[in-house]
Amino acid sequence: MDKNTGAEIEEIRPGSQADASGIAPGDVILSINGHKVNDTIDFMFFAGDGFLDMLVRRKDKRLSFRLQTEEGKDTGIALKPFKIKTCTNKCIFCFVGQLPKGLRRTLYIKDEDYRMSFLYGNYVTLTNLSPQDKKRIVEQRLSPIYISVHSTNNAVRKMILGNSK
């Protein structure tokens, strides 16, 4: 696993299982029970098993930790936010492009990220999904995902979205 994989820990709750085990902020979770972890969704999905064998990267070292969690209790681990996948469409109606200048920066983020849809209810057109993303959505039962449908006619859809997909 390279340095660009994993989910970085932002905070450890004092007195938690993670705190007692020696896991620390800045550690990067590489896997849980042999399953690769890339973001918050992977972490939540795989951390529900009760017994967690975690592989963590700390600087240039790989460390193993074993946690036992009770059902309904969290591990005490808070992850840093993942990098949002941005939109590559050139929609003729894009509200982000129509915003006035001078608003807060976060309003100008054109996200097209199914993870944001699942976690926060953002709408997506699904034009940038990879085969791996589709597989993950099914395997992890990521629902609901809010889909922005503007036309079911493929030619019209491509024209409206400004995207050949």
Locate predicted features:
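Conserved Radical SAM active-site core
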Residues: 62, 71-165
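N-terminal alpha-helical targeting/anchoring segments
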Residues: 37-45
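A residue-level detector for short acidic-glycine micro-motifs
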Residues: 11-14, 31, 45
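PDZ-domain C-terminal substructure recognizer with occasional recognition of PDZ-binding tails
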Residues: 44-78
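Conserved PDZ fold ligand-binding element
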Residues: 18-38
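PDZ/PDZ-like groove recognition
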Residues: 1-13
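N-terminal functional module detector in eukaryotic proteins
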Residues: 24, 38, 53-54, 90
